[in-house]
Swiss-Prot record:
One GO BP annotation of this record: intracellular signal transduction
Organism from which the protein derives: Dictyostelium discoideum
UniProt region (Disordered), positions on chain: 1-86, 115-194, 287-313, 428-582, 769-919
Keyword Kinase: yes
Residues that hold ATP according to the record: 628-636, 654
Listed Low complexity bias regions: 116-147, 177-194, 287-311, 431-491, 499-525, 533-581, 769-864, 872-900
Family: Belongs to the protein kinase superfamily. Ser/Thr protein kinase family. CDC7 subfamily.
GO molecular function: ATP binding; metal ion binding; protein serine kinase activity; protein serine/threonine kinase activity
Catalysed reactions, semicolon-separated: L-seryl-[protein] + ATP = O-phospho-L-seryl-[protein] + ADP + H(+); L-threonyl-[protein] + ATP = O-phospho-L-threonyl-[protein] + ADP + H(+)
Coiled coil: 315-393, 558-588
Top EC class of this enzyme: transferase
Protein name from the UniProt record: Probable serine/threonine-protein kinase cdc7
Domain Protein kinase: 622-1048
EC number: 2.7.11.1
Length: 1061
C-alpha cells in the first residue's frame, strides 16, 4: 500500500452517533476510500495521514484536524520528515501465544552473540517476568503499567528506509469499486481491508480488558501502546507475505530523546497479541485482523480515544466462543440448581418451623388442660369439704358422686409421689368432728359389755389388734373440744415440743414391756399428705367411746363413757403405751402411704412366719405382713415395699396358684390394664413371676365387712352404694368386659373413708358388643355417686375374733366371709351361741366356690340336655329333701329315657360359661344359655339390693345350680321361668305350678321379722329391684339406664342442690 503525500483530496469527517464523537479513518488516495463507522458508544479519532507531510495530531474530542498546523495540548510536536534519516524500521516478528507471555523478538543484521550475552547479563540483573505482571507494578520507566519487555538494540542497527511505495492496480476504478465499503455493523467480511481494533482506556489500572469486552467478537488478545504513530508498510503486496510495523520515536511520550549510539539504551518493545493473516494477492480477499487491546496510559490525551474495527472471527476464535458459551450455560445451570436447592432448604426450614409451632401449641394446650383439670379437682374438693361439714345425721354419711381418677396405669419403676396418694378415694375425708352416729354392729346395745367381739374389749381377745384409737396425722387436725369433752387428762395435747418429747414414766415403761408391740391401731387420717419424716407434733389421743370420732357433742361422749366404764382402765394403759410408741415408731398407714426408714427397719427386724423360701419372687422387694384372703385359685397378702423408690408402700400381693391356666392369668391382667384405675375399679401396679408362680401387685384397700353394715343402711346409704356400683359396672361394660363375679365381698366399702372399690377380675370375660351394653347415656357417665376415697385406716367394727375378716381384699369366700341365713329376731346372746353353727354352715356352703365356677363336674353332661327337671318345692318356696322328692325326680328321669334316645343323634351342645358365685348367678347362667351378656352382672346387683332391703345375707343358699333355680322359681313363679326357658331355647319341667310372690311383700315380711332399720322403703327402690331381677336378660335394665333411674337421679339432684347452696 502506497501512501501518497501529494494527494490533495483528503476527506475529513466527524460523525456523532449516540452522543459520542465518531471519527473515520480517511485514507487520502485517488483510488480508494475507506469509511468505517461504529454505532457503538466508542470515541473514534480521526487519523489523517499524508505521505509528503506526515502530520500526527493528538487532540481532545473537540479539536479540529489540521494538516499543516500541528497543535498539541501537551506541546509535543510529532511532525517528522519522511526524507530524514530518523526513520528506522525494526522488523519484528510477533507470534500469538495464549496465555500471554513475553514474545520472542528477532532482528535483522544483528549480532546474536552479543545480544545473547547482554540478554544473559540483563536476566541476571533483572529477571524478566514469565507472565505479564499486574497493573501498577514497578518496572516501567515512565511510571505506567509494566506491559512491555525490553530488548537491548546495538547502535547503528536501524537503517533509514525510503518511503514505501504503492503500486496501484491496472484499473483504478475497479480497485475503488472493490475497496469502497461502508460498514456500520462491526463486521467486515470478504473485504480487502486491514482492520485494526484498538481500545484506548484512560484508566491506568486496567490490565487487559478481557472481561469487560467479553460480548464483543473483537476481544483483547494483547496490549500495545498506541501513543506513537503506526505505519503499515507493505512494499510488495502481491509477493510479500510479511507485515511490518514501523516504529518511530514517540514524541507524545514525555521521555528523553532516544540515543541509538548508547549501548545501554533499551528500546521499549510492546508485547501485544497479534493475529496477522495476509493473503498473497491484494486483489483477492484479504482479511488481516489486528486485534489489539491497549491501555492508554498517556496523560497528554485528555479524552478517551477508542478506535475499533471489526472483522470476521477465525475458526479458533469461534471454538473459543463456543467454549465460552458452553461454560456460561453450565454456570447458569449450576446457578439454577443452587437456587433450586436453596428453595428446597427454605421450604424444609419452613416446614420444620411449622411443625415446631404445632408442637408448641399442642404442649400449651395440654398444659392448659392439665391446669384446668387440677383447678376443677380443687374446686370439687372444696365443695366436698363444705358438704361434709354441713352433714350431721345419725346414719352413715355418703358424699356425692366422685371425680373419676385420671391416671389409668401405674408403674412401680417411678416414685409413687407422681401418682395420687388416694387412688380410689376422694382427697377429702368425712369430717371427724361431726355428730354422725356409726352403725352399731350388735343387735342390742345393752349387751355391749358382754359381747366378746366388742370393739372396746378386743384388747383381751385379739392381741391388741383392734384397739380403738384416734391418730391425727396433721399438725393442725386436733380439735380443741376433744380435750374438754373427754374426761381423760392423758388426752390433752401438749403445747410445746419439749413436752411431746419427754421421756416416758417408769410405769409406762413397765406396761410397754408387759404388752407386745405388735398391736395394730386404727388410725384416722385427717389430711391426704403424709410426711415421710417424723414430726414432733404428732400425738395419739384415745377417746373412751365406740364411735372412734372426735365428737363435739358432750352428751354423746358422756353416754359412751357411761357404757364403757369397764374399759377405761384398759384404754388408759393403751394410751400410755401408744404415746411411747409414737415417739419411736410411725405406724404404717395404709393405701399408698409411706413410713419412715427407721420404722421400716424395726418392722423388718420383727420375726415373721412367712419365709423367703416359700415366696421366692418377692425376696428383697416386699415383706409380707399378714394374710388377708384365701381362695381356690389365689391368696392375698398384705405386704410392704422394702426396696426401690416406693419403699414403705403398703400393697396387696395376689399370688395366683400355679395350677391356674395362663390364659386366665393373662385375661385378668389385660382386664385390669384396660379398665383399672377409673370409676372405683382396682388398678394394677405390676406383676412378678418366678417359674410358674405369678404374683399381682395391687393397691391395699381398708374396708368394712358387708355383714356388719348391710342391715343398718338407710335409704340414702343404699342410694350411694348402688350409684357407685352401677357406675363401675357401666365403665367396664362399655369396654365390653363382664365381671361375672359381682358380690359384696368383691365390691369393697369403707364406711369411715366413704370409698368403694371393685376388685377380683379373675373370672372376667370379654363380651361382644350387645344391645344390653350399647344404650349408654353420656349424661350419666360424667357423674358417679360412688366415692373413691381410700384412706389409710377405718374402724374395725367387726364381730369376728379373726383379724383376717377386716381386710377381705380378695373377694373369694372364706370361713368368716359368709354367715348362714341370719335370723335377726334372735337376741345378741343367741348370736353368740349360734356362731359355731354358722361357721359350720359356711364350711358346707362355701367349700371351694370356684370349683363349681371353673371346673365341670360329671353332672354337666346331664345338665346340658334340653329338658331340665327341677326338684319339688313347698308352698313356702323351700326345696324338699325327703325320699318322695327324690323318687319323683327319678321317675321323671326314667319317663324321659325315650326322649334321651332321640337326643343321642343330635350334636353335642356347646358348653356354656357358668363362672360365678352360688346365690348370685342369673337364670340364663343356671339354664346354661350360650349367648350370655353383661346382664348377668345386673342380676347380681339385684341380689345385693335384695339382701339390703330384706335384711338377709346371703339370700339364696343352694349347693348346686338346680337348687338355685328352684329358689328363684319359688319367688318369681313357674310361668315366668318357663317362658324365659322357651325364649332361650331351653325346656324346663316343674312338678307343680307356683304363683309369683311380689318383691315388695317378700321384703316387707322379712324386714318386719328382722331387727334391721324399720325405715320405709320407697316405691322407686322396689321398682329398681324388680328391673334388676328381671328373669329376661333382654329386657333387664342396664348399668347406664340404672344411673338414670328416679331412685338414683333424685339423690343426685339433691346433692347438686346442696352443693349449690
Amino acid at each position: 500500500m502506497n501512501w501518497d503525500s501529494n494527494n490533495n483530496n483528503n476527506k475529513n469527517s466527524n460523525n456523532n452517533n449516540n452522543n459520542s464523537s465518531s471519527s473515520s479513518y480517511n485514507i487520502n488516495n485517488n483510488y480508494s476510500s475507506f469509511n468505517n463507522s461504529n454505532n457503538n458508544n466508542i470515541n473514534n479519532n480521526n487519523i489523517n495521514t499524508n505521505n509528503n507531510n506526515n502530520n500526527n495530531n493528538n487532540n481532545n474530542n473537540n479539536n479540529n484536524n489540521n494538516n499543516n498546523n500541528n497543535n498539541n495540548n501537551n506541546n509535543n510536536n510529532n511532525n517528522k520528515n519522511n526524507s530524514s534519516n530518523n526513520y528506522h524500521l525494526a522488523h519484528i516478528n510477533v507470534y500469538q501465544q495464549y496465555p500471554i507471555k513475553p514474545l520472542p523478538i528477532s532482528f535483522n543484521s544483528f549480532n546474536t552473540n552479543m545480544f545473547q550475552q547482554q540478554q544473559q547479563q540483563q536476566q541476571q540483573q533483572q529477571q524478566l517476568p514469565q507472565h505479564l505482571p499486574p497493573l501498577g507494578s514497578s518496572g516501567s520507566s515512565n511510571g505506567g503499567p509494566n506491559l512491555m519487555g525490553y530488548a537491548q538494540i546495538p547502535p547503528n542497527y536501524f537503517k533509514p528506509l525510503s518511503p514505501p511505495s504503492f503500486h496501484p492496480p491496472t484499473s483504478p476504478q475497479s480497485f475503488f469499486n472493490n475497496n469502497t465499503n461502508n460498514n456500520n455493523n462491526n463486521n467486515n467480511n470478504n473485504n480487502n481491508n486491514i482492520n485494526i481494533n484498538i481500545n484506548n482506556n484512560n484508566n491506568s489500572n486496567n490490565y487487559i480488558n478481557d472481561s469487560t469486552n467479553s460480548n464483543n467478537l473483537n476481544t483483547s488478545n494483547g496490549a500495545i501502546n498506541t501513543s506513537s504513530h503506526l505505519f503499515i508498510n507493505s512494499p510488495n503486496h502481491h509477493s510479500d507475505n510479511r507485515s511490518f510495523i514501523e516504529s518511530r520515536s514517540p514524541a507524545s511520550m514525555n521521555a528523553s530523546p532516544i540515543h541509538f549510539n548508547d549501548p545501554t539504551f533499551k528500546v521499549p518493545v510492546h508485547l501485544p497479541s497479534l493475529s496477522i493473516t495476509n493473503s498473497p494477492s491484494l486483489n483477492s480477499s484479504i482479511d488481516s485482523s489486528y486485534r489489539l487491546n491497549n491501555n492508554n496510559n498517556n496523560n497528554n490525551n485528555n479524552g478517551s480515544n477508542n478506535s475499533s474495527f471489526n472483522s470476521t472471527p477465525t475458526k479458533f476464535e469461534q471454538l473459543q466462543l463456543q467454549l465460552q458459551q458452553q461454560q456460561l450455560q453450565q454456570q447458569l445451570q449450576q446457578q439454577q440448581q443452587l437456587q433450586q436447592q436453596q428453595q428446597q432448604l427454605q421450604q424444609q426450614q419452613q416446614l420444620q418451623q411449622q411443625q415446631q409451632q404445632q408442637l408448641q401449641q399442642q404442649q400449651q394446650q395440654q398444659l392448659q388442660q392439665q391446669q384446668q383439670q387440677q383447678q376443677q379437682q380443687l374446686q370439687q374438693q372444696q365443695q366436698l369439704q363444705q358438704q361434709q361439714q354441713q352433714q350431721s345425721t345419725s346414719h352413715i354419711h355418703f358424699s356425692t358422686a366422685p371425680t373419676p381418677i385420671v391416671s389409668h396405669h401405674y408403674n412401680l419403676q417411678q416414685p409413687l409421689q407422681q401418682y395420687p396418694q388416694n387412688i380410689y378415694s376422694h382427697t377429702n375425708i368425712l369430717n371427724q368432728n361431726n355428730n354422725s352416729k356409726p352403725i352399731n354392729t350388735n343387735s342390742s346395745s345393752s349387751n355391749n359389755n358382754n359381747n366378746n367381739n366388742n370393739n372396746n374389749n378386743n384388747n383381751n381377745n385379739n392381741n391388741n389388734n383392734n384397739n380403738n384409737c384416734n391418730y391425727n396425722n396433721s399438725n393442725n387436725s386436733y380439735n380443741n373440744n376433744t380435750t374438754n369433752t373427754n374426761n381423760n387428762p392423758n388426752n390433752k395435747r401438749s403445747q410445746t415440743k419439749n413436752q411431746q418429747q419427754q421421756q416416758p414414766q417408769p410405769q409406762q415403761q413397765q406396761l410397754q414391756q408387759q404388752q407386745p408391740q405388735q398391736s395394730v391401731i386404727n388410725v384416722n387420717k385427717k389430711t391426704t399428705k403424709v410426711s415421710k419424716t417424723k414430726t414432733s407434733n404428732q400425738k395419739l389421743t384415745v377417746n373412751n367411746n365406740n364411735n372412734n370420732n372426735n365428737n363435739n357433742n358432750n352428751n354423746n361422749n358422756n353416754n359412751n363413757n357411761n357404757n364403757n366404764n369397764n374399759n377405761n382402765n384398759n384404754n388408759n394403759t393403751i394410751q400410755q403405751q401408744q404415746q411411747q410408741q409414737s415417739n419411736d415408731i410411725k405406724l404404717l398407714l395404709k393405701n399408698s402411704i409411706y413410713s419412715s426408714r427407721n420404722d421400716l427397719k424395726e418392722l423388718l427386724s420383727q420375726p415373721t412366719e412367712y419365709t423367703d423360701s416359700e415366696y421366692p419372687e418377692i425376696v428383697g422387694k416386699y415383706r409380707i405382713l399378714e394374710k388377708i384372703g384365701q381362695g381356690t385359685f389365689s391368696g392375698v397378702y398384705k405386704s410392704v415395699c422394702i426396696d426401690g423408690p416406693n419403699i414403705g408402700l403398703i400393697v396387696a400381693l395376689k399370688r395366683v396358684a400355679p395350677t391356674s391356666s395362663p390364659a386366665r392369668i393373662l385375661n385378668e391382667i389385660h382386664s385390669l390394664l384396660r379398665v383399672g384405675g377409673h370409676y372405683n375399679v382396682s388398678a394394677l401396679f405390676g406383676a412378678l413371676r418366678y417359674k410358674d408362680q405369678v404374683t399381682l401387685i395391687l393397691p391395699f384397700f381398708e374396708h368394712d365387712s358387708f355383714k356388719d353394715y348391710f342391715f343398718q343402711m338407710s335409704n340414702e346409704n343404699i342410694k350411694h352404694y348402688l350409684y357407685a356400683l352401677f357406675d363401675s359396672l357401666r365403665h367396664i361394660h362399655q369396654n365390653n368386659i363382664c365381671h361375672r363375679d359381682v358380690k359384696p365381698t368383691n365390691f369393697l366399702y369403707s364406711i369411715k373413708n366413704n370409698s368403694f372399690l371393685l376388685i377380683d377380675f379373675g373370672l372376667a370375660q370379654e363380651m361382644p358388643n350387645s344391645n344390653s351394653n350399647s344404650n349408654s347415656n353420656s349424661n350419666s357417665n360424667s357423674n358417679s355417686n360412688s366415692n373413691s376415697n381410700s384412706n389409710s385406716n377405718s374402724n374395725n367394727n367387726n364381730n369376728n375374733n379373726n383379724n383376717n375378716t377386716n381386710n377381705n381384699f380378695n373377694g373369694n369366700n372364706s370361713n368368716n366371709d359368709f354367715n348362714n341365713f341370719i335370723n335377726m329376731n334372735n337376741s345378741n346372746s343367741n348370736n353368740n351361741n349360734n356362731n359355731n353353727s354358722n361357721n359350720n354352715n359356711n364350711n358346707n356352703n362355701n367349700n371351694n366356690n370356684n370349683n363349681n365356677n371353673n371346673s365341670n363336674n360329671n353332672n354337666n353332661s346331664n345338665n346340658s340336655q334340653e329338658e331340665i327337671i327341677l326338684p319339688s318345692t313347698n308352698e313356702n318356696g323351700t326345696t324338699t329333701s325327703n325320699a318322695s322328692s327324690t323318687s319323683n325326680t327319678t321317675s321323671s328321669s326314667s319317663s324321659s329315657s325315650n326322649k334321651s334316645k332321640n337326643l343321642r343323634n343330635d350334636p353335642k351342645p356347646q358348653p356354656a360359661p357358668r363362672a360365678g358365685t352360688r346365690g348370685f348367678r342369673a337364670p340364663e347362667v343356671l339354664l346354661k344359655y350360650n349367648k350370655q351378656t353383661t346382664a348377668i352382672d345386673i342380676w347380681s346387683v339385684g341380689v345385693i339390693l335384695l339382701c339390703m332391703i330384706s335384711g338377709r345375707y346371703p339370700f339364696f343358699i343352694s349347693p348346686d345350680d338346680m337348687t338355685s333355680l328352684a329358689e328363684i322359681v319359688s319367688i318369681i313363679g313357674t310361668k315366668k321361668i318357663v317362658d324365659i326357658a322357651h325364649l332361650l331355647e331351653k325346656k324346663i319341667s316343674i312338678s307343680h305350678s307356683i304363683p309369683p310372690t311380689p318383691w315388695r311383700d317378700l321384703s316387707r315380711r322379712l324386714r318386719s321379722e328382722s331387727s334391721c332399720d324399720k325405715q320405709d322403703v320407697p316405691v322407686e327402690l322396689y321398682d329398681l329391684l324388680e328391673r334388676c331381677l328381671d328373669p329376661n336378660p333382654l329386657t333387664r335394665i342396664t348399668a347406664s339406664e340404672a344411673l338414670l333411674h328416679p331412685f338414683l337421679v333424685v339423690n343426685n339432684n339433691s346433692n347438686n342442690n346442696n352443693n349449690n347452696s
